[in-house]
């Protein structure tokens, strides 16, 4: 934390006994890849910043809520943060451990030292003072909560789209006697060896967990509620994502989608034959509209075709020893894994007029201006909410940090002019 002044009252409307720390630079909420990218770019511009993080270290999602076999689903060239490339000895698709080493090295390189175990409980704009007021609660080793208020002209929301787990409300879920967990708690299929496991969800995580379960001697069943696009991770020896990005420079998105689906059918065959219906919209069009990514196959598809991974319909209800599906069939299971994703927690703490975020914590549509993809009113910025992954987060971080640094430099120049009078 740089360039701060400590005050007593603060005028923030919170606990009068809590300190208020007035910051010269922005306050960044979140020390994941997005927050680190903003901080690093501000460092490059010579501007101060303060990062607050609710967990005990950087990249909490990657450290504590991912499975062991996870790799980046896109080639490393599309996942680099600003200013630093991946080491040349890293594989094309880095493991989660590779990526964590990269992130920790990145933080050290730019001397980013987040204030850890600070959970933001409220952030609001103080119009009379022209400052963002951010209240955090810190739990120390003695389990005593410490409330602190920070004040800054700029607030960067970098807490991400994956802050809270999503578990669907399914009738009878509490009655299921077997183990039930969210995918954030899954590490390896070893503990499920010999068990019948229902995986609810057919995204990239659900598919890869089914693959992992198979490889560890479990019997996975994947519950599919809606259509899903499965694409080979590579086409013609190159990354499917990379090919799509190149084609989009010259062709409309619908035409690129047709090409991807044609090649996917040639490589994978007819996915609907095995219970995976394709949506009416193409994979890139869906990604553009909803942010939902297609599945990039890393081996699960061949096990679906061979019957080692079985596709089942949407779950209607749970019983003590299994599940009933919407087609009326019932099956017994030893465990259930909800690979049902995450959501933003921004609405629980950010108080704004809805100009930047929806009530669900998603980034509001930018309309005709791309500016609103990363900047809101009164010095409010967001990074990592555009649904474009690490590549998009890096681009947003560059723009947000450059904008903040320019405004900070203006305030410094104005202060220097006043002091020289």
Swiss-Prot record:
A Pfam family annotated for this UniProt entry: FMO-like
Cofactor(s) of this protein: FAD
Expression tissues: Expressed in leaves, young panicles and young kernels. Highly expressed in embryos. Expressed in roots, shoots and panicles. Expressed in root tips, leaves, stems, young stem nodes and developing grains.
Molecular function per GO: flavin adenine dinucleotide binding; indole-3-pyruvate monooxygenase activity; monooxygenase activity; N,N-dimethylaniline monooxygenase activity; NADP binding
Catalytic function, reaction form: indole-3-pyruvate + NADPH + O2 + H(+) = (indol-3-yl)acetate + CO2 + NADP(+) + H2O
Domain of life: Eukaryota
Gene Ontology cellular component annotations, sorted alphabetically: endoplasmic reticulum
UniProt binding sites for FAD: 30-35
Further comment: Calli overexpressing YUCCA8 exhibit high levels of auxin, low regeneration frequency, overgrowing roots and abnormal root morphology.
PANTHER family listed in its UniProt record: FLAVIN-BINDING MONOOXYGENASE-LIKE PROTEIN (AFU_ORTHOLOGUE AFUA_4G09220) (PTHR43539), INDOLE-3-PYRUVATE MONOOXYGENASE YUCCA8 (PTHR43539:SF51)
Name this protein carries in UniProt: Indole-3-pyruvate monooxygenase YUCCA8
């Amino acid at each position: 934390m740089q360039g701060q002044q400590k005050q007593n009252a603060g005028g923030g409307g919170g606990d009068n006994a809590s300190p208020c720390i007035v910051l010269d630079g922005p306050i960044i909420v979140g020390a994941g890849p997005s927050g680190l990218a903003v901080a690093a770019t501000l460092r490059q511009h010579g501007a101060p910043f303060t990062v607050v993080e609710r967990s005990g270290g950087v990249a909490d999602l990657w450290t504590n809520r991912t499975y062991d076999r996870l790799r980046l689903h896109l080639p490393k060239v599309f996942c680099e943060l600003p200013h630093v490339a991946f080491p040349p000895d890293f594989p094309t698709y880095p493991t989660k451990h590779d990526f964590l080493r990269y992130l920790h090295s990145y933080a050290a390189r730019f001397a980013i030292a987040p204030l850890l175990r600070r959970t933001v409980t409220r952030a609001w704009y103080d119009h009379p003072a022209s400052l963002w007021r951010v209240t955090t609660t810190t739990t120390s080793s003695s389990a005593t909560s410490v409330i602190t208020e920070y004040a800054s002209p700029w607030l960067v929301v970098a807490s991400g789209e994956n802050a809270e787990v999503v578990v669907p409300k399914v009738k009878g879920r509490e009655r299921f006697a077997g183990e039930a967990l969210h995918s954030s708690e899954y590490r390896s299929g070893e503990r499920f060896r010999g068990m019948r496991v229902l995986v609810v969800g057919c995204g990239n995580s659900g598919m890869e967990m089914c693959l992992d379960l198979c490889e560890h001697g479990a019997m996975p069943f994947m519950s599919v509620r809606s259509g899903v696009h499965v694409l080979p991770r590579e086409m013609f020896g190159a990354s499917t994502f990379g090919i799509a990005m190149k084609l989009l420079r010259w062709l409309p998105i619908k035409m690129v989608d047709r090409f991807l689906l044609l090649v996917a059918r040639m490589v994978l065959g007819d996915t609907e034959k095995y219970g995976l219906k394709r949506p009416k919209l193409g994979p890139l069009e869906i990604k553009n509209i909803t942010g939902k990514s297609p599945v990039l196959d890393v081996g699960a598809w061949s096990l679906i075709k061979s019957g080692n991974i079985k596709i089942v319909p949407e779950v209607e209800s749970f019983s003590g020893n299994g599940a009933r599906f919407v087609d009326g069939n019932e099956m017994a299971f030893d465990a259930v894994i909800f690979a049902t994703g995450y959501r933003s927690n921004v609405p629980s703490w950010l108080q704004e007029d809805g100009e930047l975020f929806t009530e669900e914590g998603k980034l509001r549509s930018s309309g005709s201006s791309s500016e609103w993809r990363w900047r809101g009113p009164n010095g409010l910025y967001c990074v990592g909410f555009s649904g474009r992954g690490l590549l998009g987060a890096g681009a947003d971080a560059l723009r947000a940090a450059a904008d903040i640094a320019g405004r900070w430099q203006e305030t410094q120049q104005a202060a220097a002019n006043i002091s020289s009078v």
